[in-house]
């Protein structure tokens, strides 16, 4: 008779849970060791118990070396994934243009079915809408930047206008002080004679 299938869910009894953890951890370590020996693979295994105790296993290579290799590979994979997503974005448009070129240039035009043309048109419309959305986004950012610049220039203009007004008042007061009997003359400002 075979074993009955155990439902995979959290074991409520603490002692049963600990026994199961120990047995399964040992089984997992044994499987990792077998994989290392049979396939000549570098294997690193980390297990953390519910109480926070760390159990580890590593084959021939040092655990730290294996984890360093994993870290480097993972970083490279992330970079490649980022480049791939950018390339897919640009590549899909490039592929679409190549598809249009192959379907509609030369003698191939006569052999293209209506369904293929409809599908090609849908792809072109999708690419066009994506391009328009990106263009709109960039234009909105540009408008926002220009509005911000306009606001700064208006504020600067107000500051300069108030400074000019203050300078004008100071100049007018100085002129009034120099004219005889407080009268404002339309003539040029009075200058002092040169001293000999």
Curated annotation (Swiss-Prot):
Its GO biological process annotations read: cell differentiation; flower development; negative regulation of flower development; positive regulation of transcription by RNA polymerase II; regulation of circadian rhythm; regulation of photoperiodism, flowering; response to temperature stimulus; vernalization response
Q: Which CDD domains match?
A: MADS_MEF2_like
- GO CC: one term? nucleus
Q: Does the keyword Metal-binding apply?
A: no
Q: Where is the K-box domain?
A: 80-170
The residue ranges of the MADS-box domain are 1-61
Record note on disruption phenotype? Early-flowering phenotype at elevated temperatures (e.g. 29 degrees Celsius) but not at room temperature (e.g. 22 degrees Celsius).
Q: Where in the cell is it found?
A: Nucleus
What is the induction note for this entry? Epigenetically down-regulated by vernalization. Vernalization repression is initiated by VIN3. Repressed by silencing mediated by polycomb group (PcG) protein complex containing EMF1 and EMF2. Up-regulated by HUA2. Down-regulated by VOZ1 and/or VOZ2. Down-regulated by RBG7. Accumulates at elevated temperatures via a JMJ30/JMJ32-mediated epigenetic regulation (e.g. removal of the repressive histone modification H3 lysine 27 trimethylation (H3K27me3)).
Which segment of this protein is annotated as the motif Nuclear localization signal?
A: 8-15
Cystine pairs annotated here are: none
Coiled-coil annotated spans: none
**Keywords, ordered alphabetically:** Developmental protein, Differentiation, DNA-binding, Flowering, Nucleus, Repressor, Transcription, Transcription regulation
The molecular function GO annotations come to: DNA-binding transcription factor activity; protein dimerization activity; RNA polymerase II transcription regulatory region sequence-specific DNA binding; transcription cis-regulatory region binding
SMART domains referenced in this protein's UniProt entry, alphabetically: MADS
Q: Does the keyword Magnesium apply?
A: no
Q: What does this protein do?
A: Putative transcription factor that seems to play a central role in the regulation of flowering time in the late-flowering phenotype by interacting with 'FRIGIDA', the autonomous and the vernalization flowering pathways. Inhibits flowering by repressing 'SUPPRESSOR OF OVEREXPRESSION OF CONSTANS 1'. At elevated temperatures (e.g. 29 degrees Celsius), maintained at high levels in a JMJ30/JMJ32-dependent manner to prevent extreme precocious flowering.
Miscellaneous notes: Prevention of early flowering by expression of FLC requires methylation of 'Lys-36' of histone H3. Repression of FLC is dependent on histone H3 'Lys-4' methylation which is partly controlled by the lysine-specific demthylase 1 (LSD1) homologs, LDL1, LDL2 and FLD. May also be regulated by the level of histone acetylation.
> What protein name applies here?
MADS-box protein FLOWERING LOCUS C
To which species is this protein native?
Arabidopsis thaliana
Per the record, the gene is FLC
